[in-house]
């Protein structure tokens, strides 16, 4: 959390940075749950508003799992070490979110898309 704040502080102090022209996306890495990840983000968001007069946009978490720990230990991407790990799947979802320009499926659309993918064995 302190590293993220320090980086944002340096960014906001850079005369070339215009906070009105940029959106800063934040994700919580290695969170035990979505609730924990959101709580960490809320603390960062509060400090950024209070001390930097800025804002950040929450895009979620990368969940902590055994395969992520293993991937970090052997210095390989978790998506290669274990493509089916929770963390790998979340990286994929976040990549799709960013590629789509920040448009997320509603949970109903996402569930239906997953159903069709499994039904027709698409991937």
Question: Could you tell me what each predicted segment is?
Answer:
Residues 52-78, 91:
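Beta-strand-loop-alpha "switch" segments that mediate conformational coupling across diverse proteins
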Residues 27-29, 74-81:
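Short hinge/gating elements
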Residues 47, 51, 65, 101:
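Phosphate/oxyanion-binding loops and surfaces in catalytic or ligand/nucleic-acid-binding neighborhoods
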Residues 6, 67, 86:
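Residue-level recognition of oxygen-bearing side chains
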Residues 77-123:
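NTP-binding/hydrolysis catalytic cores, primarily Walker-type P-loop NTPases
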Residues 17, 39-42, 70-76, 104-110:
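A general structural signal for short secondary-structure boundary/capping elements
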Residues 1-60:
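Conserved catalytic-core segment of NTP-binding enzymes
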């Amino acid at each position: 959390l302190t590293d993220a704040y320090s980086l944002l502080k340096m960014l906001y102090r850079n005369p070339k940075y215009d906070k009105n022209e940029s959106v800063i996306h934040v994700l919580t890495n290695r969170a035990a749950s979505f609730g924990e990840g959101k709580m960490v983000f809320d603390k960062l968001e509060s400090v950024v508003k209070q001390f930097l007069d800025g804002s950040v946009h929450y895009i979620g978490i990368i969940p902590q799992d055994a395969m992520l720990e293993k991937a970090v230990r052997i210095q390989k991407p978790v998506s290669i070490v274990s493509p089916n790990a929770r963390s790998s799947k979340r990286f994929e979802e976040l990549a799709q979110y960013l590629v789509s320009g920040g448009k997320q499926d509603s949970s109903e659309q996402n569930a239906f898309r997953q159903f069709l993918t499994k039904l027709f064995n698409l991937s």
